[in-house]
Amino acid sequence: MQSRLMPSGGPGRRWAFLRVPSTPQRRAFASTRFYFQDIFQSQLEDPSSAAVYSSLQASRAVPQTLTEKIVQKYSVGLAKDKFVKSGDYVTISPHRCMTHDNSWPVALKFMSIGATKLHDPKQIVMTLDHDVQNKSEKNLQKYRQIEDFAKHQGVEFYPAGRGIGHQVMVEEGYAWPGTLVVASDSHSNMYGGVGCLGTPIVRTDGASIWATGKTWWQIPPVAKVTLTGVLPPGVTGKDVIVALCGLFDKDDVLNHAIEFTGPEETMRSLSVDARLTIANMTTEWGALSGLFPIDNVLKGWLKGKATTAAMGLAEGPFKTLAPQHFTHPLLEQLFANPLTADKGAKYAKELFLDLSTLSPYVSGPNSVKVATPLKDLEAQNIKVNKAYLVSCTNSRASDIAAAARVFKEAAEKNGGKVPKIADGVEFYVAAASIPEQLAAEEAGDWQALLDAGATPLLPGCAQCIGLGTGLLEAGEVGISASNRNFKGRMGSTDAKAYLGSPEVVAASALTGKLSGPGWYQAPEGLTEVVRGEGDGIREEDRMLTAEQALEKLIGQIDNLVADGEKQFAPEESEESSGDSLTEVYPGFPERVSGEIVFCDADNINTDGIYPGKYTYQDDVSQETMAQVCMSNYDAQFSSIAKEGDILVTGFNFGCGSSREQAATAILAKKIPLVVSGSFGNIFSRNSINNALMGLEVPRLINRLRESFSGEGSDKSLTRRTGWTLTWDVRRSRIEVQEGENGPKWTHQVGELPPNVQEIIAKGGLEKWVKNEIGA
């Protein structure tokens, strides 16, 4: 079936969309739909407008998002003229790879596969930041092992107390705009604040990159988040991301890559520090990256870094490579042709938020999905026991300055007398890095906090990850400028943790209750935060250039094509999709078939799949792993499921922790394939890394639920369905037989390309690496 755009009623007036059969169909039809013009003939006759039209025609075949463009640069082994897109599995060779305190476990994996030398030492950065307050011999020994390994391999190493790894990556220039940088930590998203595509990996990926320079990645669906308006005084980047997490709280961007955009005035109002904060907490919003544009705001920040480095001011009593990474020639090269999303790039969804309608927000208690305007919490007089100005989210010099301003202004109102934090409150401060602390000291802000009674800590993750001194005790309430407030993360599970901006943390420490500094004044008539789907621009306010009008028209036509396929020929669409055959890697099965065993639940987490009490027992046998597989979800699973079954589950299967045994236990049960509505991202990575196959087929889950919802009192957690599923790998298609005498149907699934097949065929990523290095 071919889709053709035909002029109707004369050139430049209307367009008619015709579906023209290119092959015999079981039913013939044609549909015609009309759209009013968005561009006039006079514009097309103008040479500049005509040039725009020609360029759009030439480029629209492969328009890419900014995320896709960056991945394109760092993908290896692509076919000639291949343009990557969301959903593709690619082999990536990232610009940099950072590991922190987990460097030693990664090193053990690296050595266990027979590797002895890093593929590219310059690709790797090691930092110590998580447990820096722990002076036990066991921890110090681990730190020595990491440092010795780094020195032996020639890796850039930053010791405990130098700074949080993510901050080091940014301030040292490792996270460079337009590059792909990964780290074995979930807050790698932070690099997006400087236009760098940062995304997390797991430890096995780290070992693979160390040994081969490569790992695999599936490009996520990309969500465009348009920010409009300008933040009112007293509202910060932290309020933006806290509000986004709470206002869009239905997994709107779960496992998506985010691209932030907006009018020039809006983007100009967001400093790089604010962008880093927002990008950092896109992790809590559920995203795999949070990318800001490479624009003039970033250019100004980079120029400042380059000038400081050139003058020698970046140097100090600490190691820095900033003078090598931030140079004016590099900046000129970067901004000579900065990467941007193509016109007509496809986004999985679009959301918008009007910053001018925001007020200070606080997250919690104990959930980032609960976001409340500060004024509502202030009215509740919530007593605060501990306050934390820590973490890579909000402990830069600008954040420390904002907190210090609270005390400085209070001193001015008190005749110059320095105020103290409230009785019964403990206030902890740890800078994101030594350079940030030194900048705060030079400005007098660090001392202002100490004079008020704050307790200084080494630069490090500290209470953000529940390590070190000053953790929340049972019954206590804490307010933190960090990024995560899950129950028990910052101390006792019987404590309550809130998240807010640095000034809210400081004001709460000063008053002894959850409060702000009073800098925000609500605009008259403001009743709600303006947000929603789309780009937030009202149609009556939209002024279209010729280029924008054509882009819109092309988008309408593409959507029309998709709608037509869905509405008129779903069967043909399914079959035609299978005409493009996928190469099958030698040793990978062309077909996988088995009976469906159905676990009808969403959000089955990794503890439900493999109990936590076994996670750190290294001597658990395969038989035991098979026996306890899914036991926390259903104790009867082991007796119901059989070898060769295909496990089908609900949505977001494998959410939770990063334990690899969640995948290996299913393999121990000799189940070769898991099908779900959707997977948790880290589970997906661990599955492929350990040779467990997986497919996302929402249609199958919905069909099973329709078929078995009327089973009366039978509420089995695990059900043998009598249905069979066959996955045709070459045709990227499944066939489902609904019981012996039931209907049979097929459905197209995502392609599993040969590079991923190879990892699974080799027995997982570690064995693939062994093969690559000839170990």
Curated annotation (Swiss-Prot):
Catalytic activity: (2R,3S)-homoisocitrate = cis-homoaconitate + H2O
Binding site for [4Fe-4S] cluster: 392, 461, 464
Recorded coiled-coil stretches: none
Disulfide-bonded cysteines: none
Record's cofactor remark: Binds 1 [4Fe-4S] cluster per subunit.
Pfam families linked: Aconitase (PF00330), Aconitase_C (PF00694)
A molecular-function term among this protein's GO annotations: 4 iron, 4 sulfur cluster binding
PROSITE patterns for this protein: ACONITASE_1 (PS00450)
Pathways involved: Amino-acid biosynthesis; L-lysine biosynthesis via AAA pathway; L-alpha-aminoadipate from 2-oxoglutarate: step 3/5
GO terms under biological process: lysine biosynthetic process via aminoadipic acid
Lyase listed as a keyword: yes
Family matches, as PANTHER family: HOMOACONITASE, MITOCHONDRIAL (PTHR43822:SF2), HOMOACONITASE, MITOCHONDRIAL-RELATED (PTHR43822)
Function: Catalyzes the reversible hydration of cis-homoaconitate to (2R,3S)-homoisocitrate, a step in the alpha-aminoadipate pathway for lysine biosynthesis.
Name of the protein described by the UniProt record: Homoaconitase, mitochondrial
Native source species: Aspergillus oryzae (strain ATCC 42149 / RIB 40)
